[in-house]
Amino acid sequence: MKFELDTTDGRARRGRLVFDRGVVETPAFMPVGTYGTVKGMTPEEVEATGAQIILGNTFHLWLRPGQEIMKLHGDLHDFMQWKGPILTDSGGFQVFSLGDIRKITEQGVHFRNPINGDPIFLDPEKSMEIQYDLGSDIVMIFDECTPYPADWDYAKRSMEMSLRWAKRSRDRFDSLGNKNALFGIIQGSVYEDLRDISVKGLVEIGFDGYAVGGLAVGEPKADMHRILEHVCPQIPADKPRYLMGVGKPEDLVEGVRRGIDMFDCVMPTRNARNGHLFVTDGVVKIRNAKHKSDISPLDAECDCYTCRNYSRAYLHHLDRCNEILGARLNTIHNLRYYQRLMAGLRKAIEEGKLESFVTEFYQRQGRPVPPLNVD
């Protein structure tokens, strides 16, 4: 992987990630394909929304179908027939969200398989091996996603263990001879001094890119913005910056304003299945009765397959009848909305008009622009 940085506007950056499997224009949003599929979508449909890279879930693909089935096909690309790059998370977030059925040690994490209850162990080395078999174009280190709220002492211990696990991840990644990219993950909760130690330690180990983890886990938006404003300038400028698990459209806008290059989130797909659709002026809840006889498109400014062909009334009807097609059409639209938003942000950065774009984005939704506390 090669990262090319073209231009900046304030702290926002316009560039691209170059892989053997294709080019990803940044800032980029990555749809989430947890089980080897972006829910309800064929790879061709995902590509048609404008997505150039997707995310796969190491933890879930390890449990089902498992490494051996994956290797029978080649790798995850061959298994699911996605031709572009794939980033895989390390499994850390899923393990730590298991709560009471897991035990964290210095060696790794002991837990019960949520499918059948069998005892399982996952550590940095195993995570690197699974992601190697998946053929991930971007591999994420195995870390502890520090929960929120966490006091300073807990956050410090968690961050320090994540640093030790980062080194173990790096060592196993290298010993496997993996030629793809490995990203470090910055932890430290909402504490700037801990984030400083994490960034410094990860840069000393050396990675192809750096993710900001442990945000969007329940902390106030002001804390997320503050940590991004503090951390992003410390990440080497020639490396991509990835904000994990984020988020709402406004979170993407605010991340880009603060220097983030990559995002992922289940929100566009999950919300689509719940009839919660993103449009230029905000959100449409398609199951509301007011859409029953509305023959207008979902979003007159959207060029997606759904908006070009179907009315709000039809989408409302499908949702009320629990038709699978409704969830699919909604997903196509939400994914395209996110990609159109990213394309708009990229163009605004190129033209040096990002803040004008941001102002219009919030004005269309009748909301104030959040403050930006950067030099």
UniProtKB/Swiss-Prot annotation:
**Subunit text:** Homodimer. Within each dimer, one monomer is responsible for RNA recognition and catalysis, while the other monomer binds to the replacement base PreQ1.
Q: What class of enzyme is it?
A: transferase
Gene this chain is encoded by: tgt
Binding residues annotated for Zn(2+), in chain numbering: 302, 304, 307, 333
Map out region (RNA binding) in residue numbers.
245-251, 269-273
Q: Could you state a single Gene Ontology molecular function term?
A: metal ion binding
Q: Which Pfam families match?
A: TGT (PF01702)
- What is this protein called in UniProt? Queuine tRNA-ribosyltransferase
Source organism's superkingdom? Bacteria
Pathway(s) per entry: tRNA modification; tRNA-queuosine biosynthesis
Q: What cofactors are annotated for this protein?
A: Zn(2+)
Which residues carry out catalysis?
89 (proton acceptor), 264 (nucleophile)
Residue positions annotated to bind substrate are 89-93, 143, 187, 214
- What Gene3D superfamilies does the database record attribute to this sequence? Queuine tRNA-ribosyltransferase-like
Q: Which GO terms describe its cellular component?
A: cytosol
Per its database record, what is this protein's job?
Catalyzes the base-exchange of a guanine (G) residue with the queuine precursor 7-aminomethyl-7-deazaguanine (PreQ1) at position 34 (anticodon wobble position) in tRNAs with GU(N) anticodons (tRNA-Asp, -Asn, -His and -Tyr). Catalysis occurs through a double-displacement mechanism. The nucleophile active site attacks the C1' of nucleotide 34 to detach the guanine base from the RNA, forming a covalent enzyme-RNA intermediate. The proton acceptor active site deprotonates the incoming PreQ1, allowing a nucleophilic attack on the C1' of the ribose to form the product.
UniProt record, GO biological process: queuosine biosynthetic process; tRNA wobble guanine modification; tRNA-guanine transglycosylation
What InterPro entries does its record include?
ArchSynthase1/Queuine_TRR (IPR050076), TGT (IPR004803), TGT-like_sf (IPR036511), tRNA_ribo_trans-like (IPR002616)
Please tell me the species this chain comes from: Salmonella typhi
Query: How and how many cofactors are bound, per the record note?
Result: Binds 1 zinc ion per subunit.
Q: Cite the PANTHER family for this sequence.
A: QUEUINE TRNA-RIBOSYLTRANSFERASE
User: Which UniProt keywords are listed?
Assistant: Glycosyltransferase, Metal-binding, Queuosine biosynthesis, Transferase, tRNA processing, Zinc
Family to which the UniProt record says this protein belongs: Belongs to the queuine tRNA-ribosyltransferase family.
Record field: catalytic activity: 7-aminomethyl-7-carbaguanine + guanosine(34) in tRNA = 7-aminomethyl-7-carbaguanosine(34) in tRNA + guanine
According to the UniProt entry, what is the EC number of this protein? 2.4.2.29
